[in-house]
Swiss-Prot record:
PANTHER family: EXTRACELLULAR MATRIX PROTEIN A, EXTRACELLULAR MATRIX PROTEIN A-RELATED. The gene is ecmA. This is Extracellular matrix protein A. GO terms for cellular component: extracellular matrix; extracellular region. Residues 1-22 form the signal peptide. It is found in: Secreted. It comes from Dictyostelium discoideum. Pfam families: Dicty_CTDC. Transmembrane segments: none annotated.
């Protein structure tokens, strides 16, 4: 048992030893030993050691080294001789096609590579023989390729060259048809070209020949309308041509014929108006002919009839002097005959009757001495007696009665001058009164009525101006009203109409500036809109188009910066694509090349994992392919051929059913193409024919809008054309016809306003014609009628002098006649008045020697008279007294029989009296009743004019009356009320100066009062007039202070005036300027409240505008922003509906999109997913039907790829390696051409470089030179277009030069010619606008001409035709009066005819009947006077009887009444000479009277009216001896004024009182005392100042009174300026911040402030003070807060609750 345990222990021990070192093999033997040498076993590959045993003793151990090479593919052993041995294991599988190996213990048999690096062999390995390299076949069964093989790249199927060098074919090749050469479509869809193609010239588009060989058409061709032949306009704008057109020669402008077959006109033609028929000048410059022209006779010069039907003239006419009517010489040189001439009977020499049957004259006549009547001398040298001589009674000296019973005269008699009835003067020198004198009551000065019953005048009358009717000032100083005044409505202020019917203006009106039409600001501040304004609708903000036709940009618009074409983000976040975008292709995501050149791997790339090379699964589960894989060619799935040779199908193969030929989707979603597909042409997208065969529409088609036919704009902005459009011919601009068919206008057309019919001028510059114009015939220059119906003038007219009326020569060479001529009586030769006012001479006259005065013989051979002669009265043959005391008889004495008492003739031949005679009253001539019951007229009657009713002059020139007149009350001169209700004045009125109130003397010896009288109590001591001539002071005077001048209160309590006062202008209340320069307020002013700026109402009642106002421009109605920032709504606004947000229509009628709209993303058309999770189908969608999953054909017909398809991956096309190591080629492989090494395009898109290529470095771009050595170009280079030799801008911005540049001369600026060869324009040139051909004005301001203009000759002022075809009018036209049709003078100067005129019969002269049914007349008719009912001769040759014929034809001879009721004559009658009324002599020898005689009272001596003196400061007086003299005017004044006369007015100039030496005294003047001195009063109204005056300067000084000084400067003493009392107050140191405690420092008077102490001595609180309440706030800190908050809290506590220190007191009440 013990042994067993021992053995077990040994085993365990040995196991422990062995296991201690696993890397060595240690063998312990039972050989005992003492040292290592005892244990050598002779094996050098072991370590021999002597070591202690496990339990007891020492034993030898042999440790074998380790031979493990850590290679599982070797058998490791150790040989005593050689050591470690590592024997490879046997891996050979006996297969030549594998390489056998062992790696880390794993045996592998790797298939060897049989790749011979020849792409033209199919490499494989045979299990028996090893590698095999068989040549491969490259035939692709494609007639379009040349098949070959390249050892490095493999099969090459190079596309054959299909180019037949014919530009007229499209060369192509297809698998089914082979090479084809299809003729190209040369049609450019332009009807204006002939499209063709030739091998030599290629495609040509030759312009068609549009010429129709017709010169009457403009031939053209338009892309839209094709060839058109538009008729040309042959109108040469010449009214003198007939315009037509000949197809062979073109326009024909044949001159028209203007011959009117009238010899009386000059026929011409005006280019602008047409035929012009100017009357010829028929004037032969001979005043002795009547020049005329008629159509039948032509021009005639008929001698005028010079006979004036006056036998007293010799009538003749000479070319030089014209018509003369020379008076015949009637003088027979015999003073004893009266030589006369009657126009009807001729010259007569009637013996004069020298017998005056007057015993008071001696009558005689001798050829030498003529007739003499020597008067008797009746003068007793007493002007107060009436000295007379009666042929019957002789000389009498009757005292005259000078009483005229009139209150208006002062009656007297002067022995020297006789009666003086001096009219009193009632003239009050007041134009506002009617000054009259009533014979019973005296002077009357009635105020005139100034009221003109017109509310639009201020009616007044002043002494200086008289009656004035001043128009009222209707101007309310408001330019927004039309101010007017009408008699009916008075003053009106009608608001102006500010609306200019233009929605583009803001219409407003300012009272100061008037109506304004401020253009509204349509700028919406958006760069994305074109802002404009429509006059009818207002602002239009049209969005601009930002489409740059670049698919690589997102086109948008920013309202601030404008169009933004942001490059799109092409990154699809897919590592498997190369992302790019070009303008031609748009965004492309080109797959990355994942090819690892191992065609048996699926080289792929996923968005998540990137590029992967997964071994291919050659099984495509597709019955349509043969699946295989070759390392060189890869997996092949050879498709079955499903090509049906139909380009209209997508040929594919269904995994389950076989070939699928799906019709292609030809819809390109473009409404502008007709999409189709045919077997011959394939898919075509033919542009739709948009032509609607309507030349009036612009036909177009856009992808968005489809076909549109937009009407063309026919407006050529020319008012002279009618713009229209014909669907067949297109737009036409037909010139409008401006011909008004009037020869009197020049017809033209203005492009801006349309027809202009300008009147022509017919002025022939001949004053002897009436120039007019007839709309049919043109100018008419009718000779004027020069006859002024005045026999005293010779009437003529010449071109140089015009119409002249030369006075006739009336001298008959007879000194005994006064030769005159009157319009009524013609030439008269009135016998001169031979009377020398000496009654004692016989006054006569000899035609040759003139008047003579021969002393008369006063013996009247009449026993009834005593004969004598008085120088004043002549012969005095004092009648015997035959008075029978019957006033109704003329008492006379018959030279032979004695007294004769003949009944008086009461008829005074005065239509103004009713004549009668009674014994009691005598002869009465009762004035007719002229009263028209209107007391405002002076009803009168004169012998000549009969009854008249003259409006009275109510002005009595009396300032003391109010003059007026009423129909009922007549003229009234109401005395003015002179009573001033002041008993202390003497009230009076002077007719010249007006009312005066003379004060009584109430002098109280007080220099400060004007002593006057109280109305009720007597004397009143009124303050003197202290007026310092300063309207700005209230002047007063008090006894203690003297005169004071207190400034006036200018305040008119009207807040609308600036109240001021100046010495010159006085108090003024200037209207304030209410304009606040703010167009947004209506500025006005109320007297009570002042200026107000009421905001104007800018509400335009349009919910679509934000109504605001701009201070400078006024109302601004800005369109509101209707954008709700929601792209899902169409935002708009209308006046009626306001803002609307209509949901957008998101339906794009596309079943392939999910249409939606969100506020964030806008409208989206999210394509629906048609993915069937089968990568082998083309998942598409038809817009009309929805998803289509068409099996794809993976045949890309690309020899460069191996095509496969899996449900998961889809088609796989592995690219071949095309690199030829040439940097000048793009190595590629094309499905049609195979691998190509296309020369790279080194075009850097920079036309400014010469691009080339280096095989080693690639493209080289060398800059080109663009210098063309031409000074007229700016040489530059444009990257896009290349050299740009841009003509320099030679424009000098002067449109008056032609700017050019030549290679030789450089830039030139040649002045242009603005001559338009049109005489009707003023040609000039404007730098800014160019030629200005301004039409000249042909207006001659003559209504008698049609003013026109001829392009060649200029202005044509053609006389208008004034003929109204009425023989009863004289038709004429004058510059001032225009056309007049004056009734013709039908008077044939034959008063024996009734002259008339009718339009039908013309002038007729019907004989009148002169039968007066009176047996006492011989009835006849005189052409000059008319009916003559000549009384039969009943004359008994007794001049003292009235011979009459009675109604029954019997004749009676009644004695005449010699009394002419004229006290100024001595009345007598001689049977031979008849009644005589010898004037009496009334001369009183007084130069201050005008001696005259009144028929009713006799002699009158009227005071002379002396003329106003030349010196207005003199007055006229009359001296009886000298007559009128001038004496200075007497002007009086008071003691303060110096009186003088200035310009006829007494003026008083204030005297200048001497200035006192003391400047604190002022000089003043007392009206009674004169100059006095008073002290200056200095009172500033402040009781706290001491007022004084500085005697040096005279200026007031106002020194503040001295306030008591306080030791405590915190006490302030103040003075009350009104009461003058002194009060003390303390400085207020209180603050608005109640945490500041203020105290006043007594030493300085200044406030010191300290912060209120709120420290509660608690470190755990933040101490502060509330400034509003003054209360302390002790807020515990928040100890949980962060450190920063704690610090800020502590700082806040320290700041807020600090103690002491000066607080911040920003606002103190002090």
């Amino acid at each position: 048992m013990k042994i067993s345990i021992f053995i077990l222990l040994l085993f365990i021990s040995s196991m422990v030893i062995i296991s201690v070192n696993a890397e060595t093999e240690t063998i312990q033997t039972n050989t005992a030993c003492d040292c290592d040498d005892d244990c050598d076993d002779g094996n050098r590959w072991s370590t021999d050691m002597c070591s202690a045993g496990l339990l007891f003793g020492k034993y030898c151990t042999h440790t074998q080294i380790c031979c493990d090479d850590e290679n599982a593919c070797t058998i490791d052993s150790c040989s005593k001789t050689s050591g470690c041995v590592h024997t490879p294991i046997n891996v050979d599988d006996k297969n030549p096609c594998t390489i056998d190996s062992c790696i880390k213990g794993f045996i592998s048999h790797t298939q060897i590579s049989c790749d011979d690096k020849n792409a033209c062999t199919i490499d494989s390995c045979d299990c028996s023989s090893g590698c095999q390299n068989k040549p491969m076949s490259c035939d692709d069964n494609n007639p379009c390729t040349v098949d070959s093989c390249n050892n490095s790249t493999g099969c090459r199927n190079t596309p054959i060259s299909v180019d037949d060098n014919n530009p007229c074919t499209i060369d192509s090749c297809s698998k089914s048809t082979g090479v084809v050469h299809i003729p190209i479509n040369v049609d450019d869809l332009n009807p204006c070209t002939i499209d063709a193609c030739t091998k030599e010239g290629g495609v040509t588009h030759t312009p068609v020949n549009v010429d129709d060989n017709n010169k009457c058409t403009t031939d053209s061709c338009s892309l839209f309308t094709g060839i058109t032949h538009t008729e040309i306009c042959c109108d040469d704008n010449n009214a003198c041509t007939d315009d037509s057109c000949s197809p062979s020669t073109g326009c024909v402008n044949t001159p028209i014929s203007c011959d009117d077959k009238n010899p009386c006109t000059v026929d011409s033609c005006n280019n602008s108006t047409g035929c012009c028929y100017t009357p010829i000048n028929v004037d032969d410059n001979n005043p002795c002919t009547i020049d005329a022209c008629t159509k039948s006779t032509g021009v005639t010069h008929t001698p005028i009839n010079v006979d004036d039907n006056n036998q007293c003239t010799t009538d003749s006419c000479t070319k030089e002097g014209g018509v003369t009517h020379t008076p015949v010489n009637t003088d027979d040189n015999n003073p004893c005959t009266v030589d006369s001439c009657s126009p009807f009977t001729g010259v007569s020499h009637t013996p004069i009757n020298v017998d005056d049957n007057n015993k008071c004259t001696i009558d005689a006549c001798t050829k030498e001495g003529g007739v003499t009547h020597t008067p008797v001398n009746t003068d007793d040298n007493n002007a107060c007696t009436l000295d007379s001589c009666s042929p019957l009674t002789g000389v009498t000296h009757t005292p005259i009665n000078c009483d005229d019973k009139k209150a208006c005269t002062v009656d007297s008699c002067s022995n020297s001058t006789g009666c003086v009835n001096t009219p009193i003067s009632c003239d009050d020198n007041n134009p506002c009164t009617v000054d009259t004198c009533d014979d019973s009551t005296g002077c009357c000065n009635t105020p005139i009525n100034v009221d003109d019953n017109n509310p639009c005048t201020v009616d007044a009358c002043t002494k200086s101006t008289g009656v004035t009717h001043t128009p009222v000032n209707v101007d309310d100083n408001n330019k927004c009203t039309i101010d007017a005044c009408t008699k009916e409505g008075g003053v009106t202020h009608t608001p102006v109409n500010t609306d200019d019917n233009n929605a583009c203006t803001l219409d407003n009106c300012s009272p100061l500036t008037g109506v304004t039409h401020t253009p509204i600001n349509c700028d919406d501040k958006k760069a994305c809109t074109v802002d404009s304004c429509s006059n009818s609708t207002g602002c239009v903000n049209t969005p601009i188009s930002c489409d740059d036709n670049n698919p690589c940009t997102v086109d948008s618009c920013d309202d601030i910066t404008g169009c933004c074409n942001t490059p799109i983000n092409v990154d699809d976040n897919n590592p498997c694509t190369v992302d790019a975008c070009t303008k031609s292709t748009g965004v492309t995501h080109t797959p990355v090349n994942v090819d690892d050149n191992n065609k048996c791997t699926i080289d792929a790339c996923t968005k998540e994992g990137g590029v992967t090379h997964t071994p291919v699964n050659t099984d495509d589960n597709n019955a349509c392919t043969l699946d295989s894989c070759s390392p060189s060619t890869g997996v092949s799935h050879t498709p079955i051929n499903c090509d049906d040779s139909n380009p209209c199908t997508v040929d594919s193969c269904s995994n389950s059913t076989g070939c699928v030929n799906t019709p292609v989707n030809v819809d390109d979603n473009n409404p502008c193409t007709v999409d189709a597909c045919t077997k011959s042409t394939g898919v075509t997208h033919t542009p739709v024919n948009v032509d609607d065969n309507n030349k009036c529409t612009i036909d177009a088609c856009t992808k968005e809008g489809g076909v549109t036919h937009t009407p063309v704009n026919t407006d050529d902005n020319n008012a002279c054309t009618i713009d229209s459009c014909s669907p067949s011919t297109g737009i036409s601009h037909t010139p409008i016809n401006c011909d008004d068919k009037k020869a009197c206008t020049v017809d033209s057309c203005s492009n801006s306003t349309g027809c202009v019919n300008t009147p022509i001028s017919c002025d022939d510059n001949n004053p002897c014609t009436v120039d007019s114009c007839d709309d049919l015939t043109g100018c008419c220059n009718t000779p004027i009628n020069v006859d002024d119906n005045n026999p005293c003038t010779i009437d003529a007219c010449t071109k140089s002098t015009g119409v002249t009326h030369t006075p006739v020569n009336v001298d008959d060479n007879n000194k005994c006649t006064i030769d005159t001529c009157t319009k009524e009586g013609g030439v008269t030769h009135t016998p001169v008045n031979t009377d020398d006012n000496n009654a004692c001479t016989l006054d006569s006259c000899s035609p040759s020697t003139g008047v003579s005065h021969t002393p008369i013989n006063c013996d009247d051979n009449n026993k009834c008279t005593v004969d004598s002669c008085s120088n004043s009265t002549g012969c005095v043959n004092t009648p015997i007294n035959c008075d029978d005391s019957n006033p109704c008889t003329v008492d006379s004495c018959n030279n032979s029989t004695g007294c004769v008492n003949t009944p008086v003739n009461v008829d005074d031949n005065n239509p103004c009296t009713v004549d009668a005679c009674t014994k009691s009253t005598g002869v009465t001539h009762t004035p007719v009743n002229v009263d028209d019951n209107n007391k405002c007229t002076i009803d009168a009657c004169t012998k000549e004019g009969g009854v008249t009713h003259t409006p009275v002059n109510t002005d009595d020139n009396n300032a003391c009356t109010i003059d007026a007149c009423t129909k009922e009350g007549g003229v009234t001169h109401t005395p003015v009320n002179t009573d001033d209700n002041n008993a202390c004045t003497l009230d009076s009125c002077s007719p010249s100066t007006g009312v005066s109130h003379t004060p009584i003397n109430c002098d109280d010896s007080n220099p400060c009062t004007v002593d006057s009288c109280s109305n009720s109590t007597g004397c009143c001591n009124t303050p003197i007039n202290v007026d310092d001539n300063n309207p700005c002071t209230v002047d007063s005077c008090t006894k203690p202070t003297g005169v004071t001048h207190t400034p006036v209160n200018v305040d008119d309590n009207n807040k609308c005036t600036i109240d001021a006062c100046t010495k010159e202008g006085g108090v003024t209340h200037t209207p304030v300027n209410t304009d606040d320069n703010n167009a947004c307020t209506l500025d006005s002013c109320s007297p009570s409240t002042g200026i107000s700026h009421a905001p104007i109402n800018c509400d335009d009642s349009n919910p679509c505008t934000i109504d605001s106002c701009n201070n400078s421009t006024g109302c601004c109605n800005t369109p509101i922003n209707v954008d709700d920032n929601n792209p899902c709504t169409v935002d708009s606004c209308t006046k009626s509906g306001g803002v609307t947000h209509t949901p957008v229509n998101v339906d794009d009628n596309n079943k392939c999109t999910t249409d939606a709209c969100t506020k964030e993303g806008g409208v989206t058309h999210t394509p629906i997913s048609c993915d069937d999770n089968n990568a082998c189908t083309i998942d598409s969608c038809s817009n009309s039907t929805g998803c289509v999953n068409t099996p794809i054909s993976c045949d890309d017909r690309n020899p460069c790829t191996v095509d496969t398809c899996t449900k998961e991956k889809g088609c796989q096309h592995s690219p071949i390696d095309t690199d030829d190591s040439n940097k000048c080629t793009i190595d590629a492989c094309s499905s049609t051409t195979g691998v190509t090494h296309t020369s790279i395009n080194c075009d850097d898109n920079n036309a400014c470089t010469f691009d080339s290529c280096s095989n080693s470095t690639g493209c080289v771009s060398t800059p080109i030179s663009c210098d063309d050595k031409n000074p007229c170009t700016l040489d530059s280079c444009d990257k896009k277009t290349g050299c740009c030799n841009t003509p320099i801008n030679v424009d000098d911005n002067d449109k008056c030069t032609t700017d050019s540049c030549t290679k030789e001369g450089g830039v030139t600026h040649t002045p242009i010619s603005c001559d338009d060869n049109n005489a009707c324009t003023t040609d000039s040139c404007s730098k800014s606008t160019g030629c200005v051909n301004k039409p000249i004005s042909c207006d001659d301001s003559n209504p008698c001409t049609v003013d026109s203009c001829s392009n060649s000759t200029g202005c044509c002022n053609t006389p208008i035709n004034v003929d109204d075809n009425n023989p009863c009018t004289t038709d004429s036209c004058t510059k001032s009066g225009g056309v007049t049709h004056t009734p013709v003078n039908v008077d044939d100067n034959n008063k024996c005819t009734t002259d008339s005129c009718t339009k039908e019969g013309g002038i007729t002269h019907t004989p009148i009947s002169c039968d007066d049914n009176n047996p006492c007349t011989l009835d006849s008719c005189s052409p000059t006077t008319g009916c003559v009912n000549k009384p039969m001769n009943v004359d008994d040759n007794d001049a003292c009887t009235t011979d009459t014929c009675n109604k029954d034809g019997t004749i009676t001879h009644t004695p005449i009444n010699t009394d002419d009721n004229n006290k100024c004559t001595l009345d007598a009658c001689s049977p031979k000479t008849g009644v005589t009324h010898t004037p009496i002599n009334c001369d009183d020898g007084n130069k201050c009277t005008i001696n005259s005689c009144s028929p009713s009272v006799g002699c009158i001596s009227t005071p002379v009216s002396c003329p106003k003196p030349k010196d207005k400061c003199s007055i006229s007086q009359c001296d009886s001896a000298k007559g009128c003299i001038e004496v200075p005017m007497n002007c009086t004044s008071d003691k303060c004024n110096e009186a003088s006369c200035c310009d006829g007015v007494c003026t008083s100039k204030p005297i200048s009182c001497p200035k006192p030496k003391n400047k604190c005294q002022v000089a003043k003047c007392d009206l009674i005392k004169g100059c006095t001195v008073s002290n200056v009063v200095c009172d500033d109204g402040n009781a706290c100042t001491e007022d004084s005056c500085c005697s040096d300067t005279g200026k007031c000084q106002f020194e503040p009174i001295k306030l008591p000084k306080n030791k405590n400067k915190c006490i302030i003493s103040k003075c009350d300026p009104i009461k003058g009392t002194i009060t003390n107050s303390t400085v207020n140191c209180e603050c608005d911040d109640l945490c500041n405690i203020g105290e006043c420092c007594e030493d300085t008077g200044k406030c010191n402030y300290r912060q209120k102490d709120c420290d509660d001595n608690n470190p755990k609180t933040a101490d502060s003070c509330d400034s509003k309440t003054g209360k302390c706030i002790n807020k515990p800190y928040n100890v949980i807060t962060s450190g920063s908050n704690l610090i800020s809290g502590l700082i806040g506590g320290l700041i807020g609750g600090g103690t002491g220190g000066k607080g911040d007191c920003k606002t103190c009440k002090n």
